[in-house]
Structure formats: structure tokens, C-alpha cells
């Protein structure tokens, strides 16, 4: 069953700017209309229980799309249905069926405890007292927050707060959760914990996940399908498996050695930068392995190493390059 159906969705923002006269100066009175197309006739659908990554660079149209899907913004054109409802016309009804977690926007009252927040949200969603207590207890166990559930939110670490944000969004048992940069600012351990929890609610509770993030690790770990949007248009809609093979197969390895060495490029190993004992290397995991790379160095010569995924912006460039070829 399709829980999201989007057809030719468009959003334009209209502003005004002062007209420049023949002498090169801006007029004090004359203005002209400026139309900025944030989302440009996109179409896609999402099946119930899917974990979808909706990603793109800053200003690509991600947040605008999410705001239209959740009823915050009215579309300029096109059709959108979420759980059979028109988000902009049926926003209140839809709010009982969806939840949202935003990494940079708190929904919890920081001076209250997490438990007090949950009671408050339960009353908003008209959840019966006994049912709410059972739900809080169940989710507190899943997310392992019982230890600090009665502490003021302002005293919690960012990782603990994000767990509580997720519990608050799940209290009314939504059919779908929207995540916008939920792991931003988290340390690696907290990120991994949150990723596992998102996968767990998708698998065990059957909650549909609509996920945006700039962290490639997030989407690799959580999602099975990816839509990439850029300049308001969808440039890719594919499985995570295919995206990994064609675009996430490259890793960036930065090493710091005790002594300068002569590293020779091989198939799958490309030197991006070499300065003194610092090396930045691109490794194509489809053609070689980390073991082969590490074989180029002596173990006791290695001082430091970091491994990262290809930046999202580079992935989008690769996609465009492939379309042009």
C-alpha cells in the first residue's frame, strides 16, 4: 500500500526586488517580481513500511518537500497524498498519523522532565491515561531511557535528548516518521545507537521512515531506498544496494606516517593529495580492498588513519557526469 503519493509537485516562492534604472541605481519605488522554484514538478511514491532516504545538498528542496508532505506549506502545483490525506487541507487529521524528529529543532520542553513531556504530548493526542502509561513504559524500554526519564531535559546529553525526542514522536503510534538530520551534532557512538533504534522501529513496529541527512553513514545504515534531489528536481531514485555499488563504493582514507614513502597508484587506489608524511587517498572498494591499501605501509610506520565516505556533493556530481556520458 502506498502511504505517500506525489505527482508533479511544485513549490514557488515569490519575492520582490527593486528595479535597476538605466543609470545603474536601484529605483526607490519600482519593483519587479522574482520567482524562485524550490521544488520543480517532482513525482514519487513510498510504500508502507519502507525506509526511504530523501537527500540532497543545502537548498536542494528537501526541507520544502517535507513541509509540503506534513502540511506546513501549500504546494504551488501538483498533487500530494500522505496516508490518503491531503496534507495542507487535512493537517490536523494527518498529525495524528505521523511523527517528526528534527535534529536542530526541539519539541521537548527543556525545563520539564522527559516523562512530564510525554504526559503533555499524550494529552495533546487524546491518549487514555492507562494506555499512555503502557506506551511510555514500552518505548522507554525500547529506547533505554528509564534511567533518566525523570530528569529535566536540559540536563540530558544530546544523544539522550534525541532518544527522548523519538519517544515523544512515537507516543501516538504513528504510521510514519519524518526524520530531518536526527544525528547532527552527535558523537559516533550516539549516532550508531540512534541509527540502530530507527532501524528497529522500522522493522519491529512497521513504521514507515522518511529520512533526510547529510551524513552518508546515516543513509547507508538506515535506508534501503534513496531519492536524491538537486535544484528542486529528482536526479536519482534507486535502491541503496545500487547506490552503494555505483556511488558509495569509494572511501577517502587519510593517513599520517612517521616517514615519507613512495605510494604507487594501482587500480582502485588513487592519490588525491600527498604532503610530507600526510596522504589523502581515494579507494574504490569495487576494485581493491583496505587490506591491499594497508599493505603499502609498514604497520609500525602508521601514526594516524581516518576513513570517510564520499561526500554527498561528490556523489551528485558523479550522477550528473554519468548522465552526460
Residue ranges and their predicted role:
Residues 195-284:
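ABC transporter nucleotide-binding domain
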Residues 20-27, 119, 123, 130-148:
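Conserved ABC ATPase "signature" region
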Residues 173:
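Conserved catalytic motifs of ABC-family nucleotide-binding domains
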Residues 177-181:
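Catalytic Walker B motif of ABC-type/P-loop ATPase nucleotide-binding domains
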Residues 285-325:
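C-terminal coupling/interaction segments
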